[in-house]
């Protein structure tokens, strides 16, 4: 039978949009701003690291990171993120969302600064310390995924919940753009202050010693906005759903939300008891869980996994793709800072024209169109544009067609973000019960990061030319065939989306069945 709903949860579901909603979006969103900045800014500086630490000036081309080093630098933070999502997701259900929320931010800020301070001047020492700190940076970032999503979903009303969670996630777009802008400004400033010839003109002089400061400043700068929100993150009360349904203190939940909503909220003891008993009857991966949510967990993990293979491949290696099609000039025709400047400019344009608009289209339409159809549409359009890039790939390599390639490439980002990149983050925060919500979101997100790791490590090798691979790499399938693989991955994601339930307009308890009291619970209530 359906149990009566706790009054505090009804009030939250029916609440009009208020100041505390926007505060929650900003506080949680700044974490994602830093997450995206830190995860994606490394792609901007890897070519610079190759020039600084692996250049042999007797060779005709500037140095690049060896394959194993490039994979480690690019992917180590993703490995840390996967571990952090599982650990902090579980911890968020055991200790509370707020209890561990501040720790993740501290870890991100400290490790981000430490990454920029990686010590030594030899390649081994710099890369080793950089990878060490970026792993723990990723560990902190991983915690922000389940905690931010769960906190925002549990604070929001059911009418605007999708838009509010999407708005938190949309800060990722600003983080990517901010990273590109910081790199653009820093490289432009150093390029102006320390002019240098191209590598072809003078290999030794093209590597200005001051360029070593640029990548360090870029890695550290993203901590500032997130650090400013630490105080407010600690001031947020625990979510009412955790306090009432997990910590079993409905009175405290009502008191906390009375202050937030500026209204008196009281709870009936019999309703509280029915909710608590119903929530205690089964655990993660139990038969009852698998019956109610097993297919849901399969849907959220598989779609996020498939999405991140494509999304992170595109994001982390767009600099290589732009070089291959000729949008960025050959490395030897530029000095180290000029190359960083051009890569940053390209990423800023893609973020501004494709990435950010996609996020905010999701914010605008998710509570109108629904999660399911946005995800289906996004995967479908990503498949179409990947094929549009891959089928006539030789056409796009001609200088006259570079602009068309960039436009189509930007559109794949637009429909990733106005599509599965946003919805795979939102849905797991809505469809699982309160006691397991953070854990299940962490599992879903970790599955996504497993896909990202495949994208980060696999695409680097797979996209190598079939006849003329980069130094240190074996022959790959080429960018054209790699685009076909990504198109197939997106198509599989569209098929797996058929398992995703629609949560538009429903309360969290209606989706998770937290307010359903089964026969065992009824007997326990009767005996109490």
Curated annotation (Swiss-Prot):
Keywords: Membrane, Phosphate transport, Symport, Transmembrane, Transmembrane helix, Transport
GO MF: phosphate transmembrane transporter activity; symporter activity
Keyword Nucleotidyltransferase on entry: no
Membrane topology term: Multi-pass membrane protein
InterPro entries the record matches: MFS_dom, MFS_sugar_transport-like, MFS_trans_sf, Phos_permease
Expressed in which tissues: Expressed in the root stele and leaf phloem and xylem.
Extracellular domain ranges by topology: 46-71, 121-125, 185-212, 318-348, 393-405, 464-481
GO BP: any one term: phosphate ion transport
Induction comment: Regulated by the transcription factor PHR2. Up-regulated in roots by phosphate starvation. Down-regulated in roots by high phosphate or colonization by the mycorrhizal fungus G.intraradices.
Family affiliation: Belongs to the major facilitator superfamily. Phosphate:H(+) symporter (TC 2.A.1.9) family.
Role description: Low-affinity transporter for inorganic phosphate (Pi). Involved in internal Pi transport from root to shoot. Responsible for most of the PHR2-mediated accumulation of excess shoot Pi under abundant Pi conditions, but not for PHO2-mediated accumulation of excess shoot Pi. Acts as a H(+):phosphate symporter.
Matching NCBIfam families: 2A0109
Extra remark beyond the main annotation: Although related to the sugar transporter family, it does not transport sugars.
Name of the protein: Inorganic phosphate transporter 1-2
Organism: Oryza sativa subsp. japonica
UniProt gene name: PTH1-2
């Amino acid at each position: 039978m359906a149990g009566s709903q706790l009054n505090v949860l009804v009030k939250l579901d029916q609440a009009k949009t208020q100041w505390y909603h926007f505060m929650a979006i900003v506080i949680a969103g700044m974490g994602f701003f830093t997450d995206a900045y830190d995860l994606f800014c490394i792609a901007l500086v890897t070519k610079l690291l190759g020039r600084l630490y692996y250049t042999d000036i007797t060779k005709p081309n500037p140095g690049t990171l060896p394959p194993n080093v490039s994979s480690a630098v690019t992917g180590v933070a993703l490995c840390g993120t996967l571990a952090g999502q599982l650990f902090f997701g579980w911890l968020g259900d055991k200790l509370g969302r707020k209890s561990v929320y501040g720790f993740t931010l501290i870890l991100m800020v400290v490790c981000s600064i430490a990454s920029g301070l990686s010590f030594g001047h030899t390649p081994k020492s710099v890369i080793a310390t950089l990878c060490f700190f970026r792993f723990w940076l990723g560990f902190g970032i991983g915690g922000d995924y389940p905690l931010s999503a769960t906190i925002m979903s549990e604070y929001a009303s059911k009418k605007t919940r999708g838009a509010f969670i999407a708005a938190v996630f949309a800060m990722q777009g600003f983080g990517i753009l901010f990273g590109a802008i910081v790199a653009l400004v820093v490289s432009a400033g150093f390029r102006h202050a320390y002019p240098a010839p191209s590598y072809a003109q003078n290999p030794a002089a093209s590597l200005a010693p001051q360029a070593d400061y640029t990548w360090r400043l870029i890695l550290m700068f993203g901590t500032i906005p997130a650090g400013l929100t630490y105080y407010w993150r600690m001031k947020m009360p625990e979510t009412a759903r955790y306090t009432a349904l997990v910590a079993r203190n409905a009175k405290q939940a009502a008191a906390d939300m009375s202050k937030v909503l500026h209204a008196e909220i009281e709870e009936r003891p019999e309703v509280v008891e029915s909710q608590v008993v119903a929530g205690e009857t089964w655990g993660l991966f139990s038969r009852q869980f698998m019956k109610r949510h097993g297919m849901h967990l399969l849907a959220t993990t598989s779609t996020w996994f498939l999405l991140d293979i494509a999304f992170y491949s595109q994001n982390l290696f767009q600099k290589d793709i732009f070089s291959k099609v000729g949008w960025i000039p050959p490395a030897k025709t530029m000095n180290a800072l000029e190359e960083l400047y051009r890569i940053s400019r390209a990423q800023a344009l893609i973020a501004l024209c494709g990435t950010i608009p996609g996020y905010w289209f999701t914010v605008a339409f998710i509570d109108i169109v629904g999660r399911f159809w946005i995800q289906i549409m996004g995967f479908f359009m990503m498949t179409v544009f990947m094929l549009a890039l891959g089928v006539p790939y030789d056409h796009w390599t001609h200088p006259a067609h570079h602009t068309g390639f960039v436009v189509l490439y930007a559109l794949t980002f637009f429909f990733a973000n106005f599509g599965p990149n946003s919805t795979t983050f939102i849905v797991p925060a809505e469809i699982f019960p309160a006691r397991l919500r953070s854990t299940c979101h962490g599992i879903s997100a970790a599955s996504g990061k497993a896909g990202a790791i495949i994208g980060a490590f696999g695409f680097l090798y797979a996209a190598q030319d079939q006849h003329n691979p980069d130094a240190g790499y074996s022959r790959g399938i080429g960018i054209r065939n790699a685009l076909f693989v990504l198109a197939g991955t997106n198509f599989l994601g569209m098929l797996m989306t058929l398992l995703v339930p629609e949560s538009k307009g429903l309360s969290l308890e209606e989706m998770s069945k937290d307010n359903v009291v089964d026969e065992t619970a009824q007997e326990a209530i009767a005996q109490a």
